[in-house]
Amino acid sequence: MIVEYEKDGRVAVITLNRPEARNAVSGELAQALEEAVDRFENDDDLWVGVLAGNGPVFCAGADLKAVASGNANLGTSRGGFGGFVTLERTKPIIAAVEGPAVAGGCELVLAC
C-alpha cells in the first residue's frame, strides 16, 4: 500500500509508504492520503492521528519524475497538495517527522 493505515487504541497512524522514492508525493499517494484522512475523520472511536513516513526520509515533496513525465497532478481537488494540505479536519493530526521533510514534505508537516 502506498499509504498505510493502522489503529492503535484511540490513535490512527497514517504512514507514507514510498521509501524507494523518499515518500515523494505522486497523484496516487495524494488520493490514498486523502482517503486515509477521511477514514480517520469518520471513525468516532479515534481521537488523534499521526502522519509518518516509512524509511529514512519523512517526505521529499513532489515526485519530480511524475512532474517531468507530464503528470503534475500531485493533489486532489478537495485536499490540495498531497490530498492533505487544504483538507478540512475536525480532529488533530500530528506529524511524526523522522528524517528530512523537504519542500512539499515540509508543507505536509505545516498542515498538521
For each feature predicted by the language model, list its residue ranges.
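Conserved CoA-thioester-binding segment of acyl-CoA-metabolizing enzymes
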Residues: 1-56
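An acidic, glycine-rich surface segment that forms the CoA-thioester-binding/catalytic face
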Residues: 32-34, 38-42, 48, 64-102
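Short glycine/serine-rich donor-binding loops of glycosyltransferases
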Residues: 105-106
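Short glycine-rich anion-binding loops that position phosphate/pyrophosphate groups of nucleotides
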Residues: 55-57, 99-100
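Amphipathic alpha-helical interaction surfaces in cytosolic regulatory modules
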Residues: 56-64
